[in-house]
Amino acid sequence: MGRLLAKMLFPLAMCLFVSAVSASDSPSSNEANPIVISSEAMDYDTNTITVREGKKLMVSCVFESDEQIHKSDLLWKQANGNNIDGESNPSLFSVILNEKGSKHRKTSLHFSSVHTRDTGLYTCTGRTAGGENFEKTIKLVVLPAIEWNDKDTVKGALLGEPITIDCGVKGPSGKEPMIQMTNGNGEPLDEEIWTIAGNEATIDSLKKEHAELTVSCITIEMHQETSKEEFPVVDRKDVNIEVYTLPEFETEESVQYTVIDNHVRDAIIYCNVTHSFPPVRHYTFYHGDEEIKMSDKFNIFVNVGVSQGAHLKIHNVNENDLGTYKCEANNIKAKSYHTIHLREANAPAEPKVTLIEDKRHSIIWKVESIDRDPDLPMTAVEIRHLRAGTAEASGVSDEDISDAYWKSHSIFMQRNIKDDGIYEINGLRHGHEYVWRFRQINEAGFGDSVVLRAKTLDDHDLEMMDSASDSKFPLALATLFFVCLFI
């Protein structure tokens, strides 16, 4: 019987819950009284507002008259006669403004969170410029907060696992609560997805597409007003579904490479996650069965931004660092593993570098690979340059300048491999000589370098080029004239 009554009252209750009807539209409205009070969930027959403790509440009072009224003459008052203004207290205050779409004065009574102590009478009073006084009183009834069996508004489970939404409430003893369960749009739950038993709805096996679902738990309590009539009080709790997944990788295992020689090199081991919900929070790397701790040799960097993943940086890699690594990705709800095999590969061969053209503020180079059968394909070219004077200050020949000196004194750029091998380096000072270092890079690391010197053009060089160009024109003209004589 209770369920049947709930279904009959549900449309009426929802209508009252979501709409606010102007008191001037109610049968009890006094046409001579320009004060119109409105609020959600208000019974306009008795001018009573019934709400749950802890909720926000706003009550509007509009002075619907063409007569002038000063904003200080439209007031909300408590039952004891105290005015309620914008500074009454943080949880109860009023705001005065003009009604949208008209010039009528409006004062809004705001409860940031109603309490049972707020139960009582509230009066809106207005005094016109001509001295006429009007008022209208409402009764506020604050019911104890509803207690749900499950207070969570977000429920989640792993992909493939079951999930149950409990819409039950802890009602008074012997009183059966009236409960409806709908989707987020107010429609009945899809029985092809949900299994409904009592006040619980269950999905037997979560799928990724279920992450968009919402269950609205709606309770209807019939509250008896002073007039002995029952007024429906509607409460609603939306529960959003989350589908947790294992962190996923593009493949279960991968092979990565490094170069081991007399250079100080860093090896990078990547652990890229293609999908995880929630996002991965912790990454742990293992070499064999031993967990890797942060140190001067090992450092773990986590991606920041949209892409999920991390990488392990191994400083000054050597033969002992080769072997099998394991990356553990943990998103708090679940964890998964990716295996990486770190292997040794040959460094790229030194490139063939040709000066194509020197200009006033740039130099054009052609960088080609001479290795026809590399272990790994070339991915980039590293180009560094420094002024000749800076190179000479190192105290050694250009070829013997250390990596550390290059890193601290040179301008660095890394360009992706181009089919034509042409690279123009801009931003140079005119008439200056530079020392250049070129080396190719593959997945394993960098190769042997080529060191060259090249100079940008100065004003004298440009004048010489212009003169040479000018001298070629008369010669070409004379040649043309000579040819014409024999035609």
Swiss-Prot record:
Coiled coil: none annotated. One of its GO terms (molecular function) is cell-cell adhesion mediator activity. It is found in: Cell projection, Axon; Synapse; Cell membrane. It comes from Caenorhabditis elegans. Residues 34-139, 247-354 form the Ig-like domain. The lineage of its organism: Eukaryota, Metazoa, Ecdysozoa, Nematoda, Chromadorea. A lipid is attached at residue 466 (GPI-anchor amidated aspartate). Cell surface protein which plays a role in the plasticity of cholinergic synapses at neuromuscular junctions and in the polarity of the mechanosensory neuron ALM, possibly by antagonizing Wnt signaling. One of its GO terms (cellular component) is synapse. Its main location: other. The gene is rig-3. Residues 1-23 form the signal peptide. Keywords: Cell membrane, Cell projection, Disulfide bond, Glycoprotein, GPI-anchor, Immunoglobulin domain, Lipoprotein, Membrane, Repeat, Signal, Synapse. Transmembrane segments: none annotated. This is Neuronal immunoglobulin domain-containing protein rig-3. Expressed in the cholinergic motor neurons AS, VA and DA in the ventral nerve cord and in the mechanosensory ALM neurons in the midbody. Residues 467-487 form a propeptide. SMART domains: IG. Disruption phenotype: RNAi-mediated knockdown results in hypersensitivity to the acetylcholinesterase inhibitor aldicarb, indicating increased cholinergic transmission in mutant animals. InterPro entries: Cell_Adh-Cytoskel_Orgn, Ig-like_dom, Ig-like_dom_sf, Ig-like_fold, Ig_sub, Immunoglobulin_dom.
